C-alpha cells in the first residue's frame, strides 16, 4: 500500500482486510469510477505532466489537519464590516502564526472566531495594522477599513485587506513591494516593523545594518513610495518602537548594539523623518546600560500638562525643544523613562517577588502597552515572571510640572508576547507558549498616593518586594484561545474516529483531538426491546411551540409519547384517542404531519388519516386499506403529498386538500416492473417534483411528480448500483439549492447522488464505506454547524428562550441539513461551504433519530434510539470542517472529588478555581505519553517536575482518568525520579510493566495494576537497574526491552532483582547518540541518530546481535522515525523536514536470499562496485548499502511523532498521522494509482502557478483594453483602491493569489528540493476561490471541469481519511 511493488506490503488485521474487500466489491460497479478514469485519461492526454509516476516510486499526498498554534503576531483594528451599517469600533483582533492568520471579534466580550484564512506558504516575520485616520476629505478615511501590513521570508512588504467575496471572507493583496531576497537573513529588513500612528509611513528594520522607510500616500490612491534607506554597518537592532508625535514629523526609536565596539555597548537612537526634505535624520544617540532589552514609546506628555523641556512651561520653548518624545526603556531590575532631547532620565526599580516566589533573581520587561484615557494615560508592563506593572507619568506639582514616574504591581498572568487594550475595556494577551486570554478590567490598580505599594522616580534606588496574587485582583478572564505549542508527545487513542491524545505544556491538561461530530447526551431512558425507528412530529392538538408527538415503532407494535417543555409521557388519555391510532398488531413504517393538522400513520396493512378533536384528543378521519392479500411496503411524504408502494408493484399517490384537510387518492396507480423496496421525496417542501424509487435489485428510478406536465408519474431516469438498497432519503441542500439523493446499501456502503431538477439525471456520485452492517438513514434539518461546546454550556445556563435565540442569531449561527447514517457506527453526512463531509458521531451509536426542539434544547437537538435500545435526547455540535477538522476536549488530572457543602459557596469556589486553573502554570511538564501494547485506548502520561527531581504518573482508559489506588488523586507521584524516557513492555502475558529511565542513570521497573471495577490504578516497584548512561530511546522487541545507551543497543529481559542483559550491539562509529528507534516485525530495527540520519539493522538470532546493513549518505538530525514497510522508513529532522528512505532493491534481494547470520561471517558475495566503494571510502561506507531518498517535504514544524495506521476511519488505504512541536497535526497519504498522481499533480501545478496565471491575464487584459496612460506609469508595487468591483475590474499586483508572493515550490523546498509529495494544502486553496477564478484556472486542464477538480480534492478527506 505504500508503493514499491511486492516489497511494499502493509500487514492488515482480518477486520480491516474484510472491510477493504467489501468496499472493493461495492465500488467496482459504480458509474463514478468510469467517469473518473475517463477524466484522468483526458487529463493525461491534454496536459503536459511534470510529475512522472513509476511503479517503484512512492507518491504521498500531504494535508495539514490542524494548523500550528505558535501565535507570535497580533494587531487590532476594524478589518471588515460584519454587518451593514455597523459602528466602526476597533474591536477586531487579527492573530498570526508563522504561516496563517485568524480573525476574531471581541465586541461581545469573547474571542469570537470570524474567519481562519488559508495557509500563506511563507514565514511571517512581522505584522502590524495600518489605519488611515487622518487622510483628509478626499480619501474619506472613515470609509477605509484597517489594513494589514506584513513582512515575510518572501522578501516583500505586503499590504493586505480582508474583504467579503462570494459570501466568504478572504485576503486581498493590495501591495507586494519587493525588499530583498527570499528566506530569512540578518540583513533583510523584514524582522521589525512599525507604523506611524497616523498612517503616514511604514518603518522596517533588519536584525543587522539595514532600515527602510516607506511613505504611505492615501489622498486619492493608496501608494507606497520608494524606500528611504538607513544603512548602519555593525549595528544590531534589539527592539524598535514608533513614537506618538501627533502631526509632527514621524519619529521612531531603536535599541541597537554596536558590534564594532571593543566592549558591549547598547545605543538608544531616535530617528526623525523630515517630511519636507524627504530625508531621515538621526536626531539623538545615547549610550545606555548594556542590559537594555525593551523600548516602548509614551504619548505626547505635553498634552497632559507635563513639562517636557527645561523651561518652566512648554510655551517658552522653541520648536526643537518642544518636540521632545519620551520612551520607556526596560533593563534588568529597573526601567528608565528618557526623552529625545536628553533633558530627563527617570529611573524606577522594578518591584521584585519575594525569594520564595521567584526562581530568577533578575527581572526584565518582555512586553507592554499604552492606554490613553480621556484626561490621562497609563502603561502596563509585563516582566519575565508574568507580573503586570502599572506605570503612570504625571506632572509633579512640586517641581514645575516636570514628569513624575510611578510604578506599582497590577496583576499576574502568563507570559505574553504582545498586549492589546481595546476601547471597550478589554485586555488581550498574546502568548507563544501559553493560551491566549481576553481579560476585562475590573479596576485600575492601587491609588497613586498609596506610597507603600508604589515606586517613584523621586527615589530611583528604592526597591519593593511583593507577594504575587494567587487570584486575579484587577482583571477577570472573559475568554481564552487554546494553544498547543509546544506539543512534546502524542498518542493515537482511536483510528475510527481519529482521536489523538496529547498534553498541554503549561497547564498540564490532557488534550484530546477528535475528528468526529460531537454528541452530548441530556436525557436517557429505557425502552421495550426491539425498537427500530422513530418519528417526531409537531402535536397539532396543542398550541405550544415545542409540543411534539414521538412515534416509536416495534415489530407489530407502536408507542406514542407526548413531549412538552416539562415532561414526556405516553399518550393514553382515553380509549377514543387510542382507537384513532394503530398501536398494536401491525408495524408502523411511516408517520408524518401533512397540511395544517393532519397526522398520517402508515402501517403494513393500512393507512390512517388522523385529526385532533381537542387537547390531547384525536379521531380517525380516514382509513385506507390496500386490496386483499396486498401489503404496504414503504412510504414517503412531503407537506402535501404522500406516496406508498404496494407489494403488487403499484404506487398509490395521495394529495391533501389544504382547505378541507382531506386526503385525496389519485385513481391512477402506476405499476412498476419490480417491487419497490424504498421510495423517497423531499420531506420539508410543499410540493416535490421528483420521486426516487428503489427495488431489491439495486435499480433506482426517478419518477416525475409534475402534475401539470405530460410525464407525470412516469420514469424519467435510471441508475444501477448493483447492490440491494437498505434505505433512501431525498434532501434539497438549502445552501446551494441542489437536490441530493442519499442511499444506504446492504453491504455497508453509503452513496450520495446529485439529481437534476429537470431530467432527474444522476451526477456527482459519491460513496463511503461505513461498516459491515446495512446502512439506514435519518434526516436532520436546520442544524447549526457553528455550535460548539462552549456555546452549549452557555445555552444550558440561560433559561430565557427568547434571549437565547437572540444570542444564537447574533453569533452568526449558520444552518444546514444533514443526513445521519446508521451502520456498525453512526455517521453524519453534510455539506458546508460547498464541501461535502461525512464524519462519525462520537461516543454514540444510533438506530434511528429525528430533530428535537424544546425550551431546553433550542438548537441541534436530537432524539434517538441507541443501539442498546435506549431512548436518548441530546445535542450534536462541533461539526468538522476544512478549517476545524478536530474538536478539542480538555481534562485535568489535578481535579479531586469534592465533599458535601453549601452549593452556592461551592459554585463561587468552582468559578474561582476555574479562573485560577486557566492562568496557573503547572509545576509539572509533560515528558512522554505511552500506549499499552495490547490496548491502544489505555494511555499513560508521565510528567516531570520543573523544579525538582520528581515525576507524576497518570492513566486514562477510554477517555476517563483513573484514580490512584484508594485516594482521590488522579495521579501517582514518584519522588527522586527525573524521567528521561519510558516504555511499557509486556514481559509476560499476565501483566504490563512500566520501565522508566531516570536522569541519574537508573532503569526502574514497575508493575502496572489496573482495577477497572473501581476505576483505579497502581504501580508497584519491582527493582532498579544501574546503567552507564541515560537512555533516550527504548521500545518493545518481542518480550524484551530494547534500549539505546548513547551509541550502544542493549536488549534487556525481566529478572527477579534487576533487568538482565540479553544482547549488546556496538553500532558504527559514526553513530554518537541514538534519539529514536522503531522495529519491524521483530526482524529489523531502524535507528535514528541525532546527527547521522538513519541506520537499518537486522536481527541475527544465531549471533544474538543486531547487524547494520543500510545507512544514509546525507546527515540528518533525526527527531522521530517509523517503518512504513520492511524496506521503507519515514522520518523527520529538527529543521521541519519530513522524508522517506528505502533500502535499495539489490540489498533487499540479498536479504531475502540469505540468512542474517551470513551478513557477519563473509558468506555473502556482494557486487564488485559495493566492495570497491567500501575499500576506497571506509569512513563513508560503514554499511555496504545506502538508502534511496523517496520523498522529501518541508512542513515548517518539528515533527515529534509519527503514527502509522492501517486505515483512517474505515478508509480504503493506510495513512501516516504526524504531530509537530508547534501543535501541527498533519498526515501523509499514499496515492495508489497513476491516474490519481497525475490528477493531483495537475491541480497542484495550476495552483502553484496561479500567481503568474492571474497576473499575466491581468496584464493582457490591461493591454487589450488600452488602459489609461497614468495607470501604466504607476510605480511597481503600488495599487489603486477603487472600491469593490468584480474580479475582472480589480487591479492585481504580482503574487496576489499567494497573498505574500512566496513561491510555493521554494517554500516547500526550504532545505532540500521537494520530492514526490503533493501539497494538499495548496490543492484545497482551489476550494476557496470564487467560481470565476476556478473556471479560469481549470482552462489549463483541458477537458476537465471544475466539478471534477473539486470532487478529486474532496475525495481525500471523505474517502481516504
Swiss-Prot record:
Pfam family, one: Beta-prop_RSE1_2nd
Segments for region (Disordered): 788-811, 893-912
The keyword Cell membrane is assigned to this record: no
Keywords, alphabetical: mRNA processing, mRNA splicing, Nucleus, Spliceosome
Coiled coil: none
Transmembrane segments: none
Swiss-Prot/TrEMBL GO biological process terms: mRNA splicing, via spliceosome; spliceosomal complex assembly; U2-type prespliceosome assembly
Signal peptide: none
Quaternary organization: Belongs to the SF3B complex, a U2 associated sub-complex of the spliceosome. The SF3B complex is composed of at least CUS1, HSH49, HSH155, RDS3 and RSE1.
Function: Involved in G2/M transition. Required for pre-mRNA splicing and endoplasmic reticulum (ER) to Golgi secretion pathway. U2 snRNPs associated protein required for the pre-spliceosome assembly. The involvement in ER to Golgi secretion is probably indirect and due to the splicing of the pre-mRNA coding for SAR1, a small GTP-binding protein required for COPII vesicle formation from the ER.
Protein family membership: Belongs to the RSE1 family.
Protein name per Swiss-Prot or TrEMBL: Pre-mRNA-splicing factor RSE1
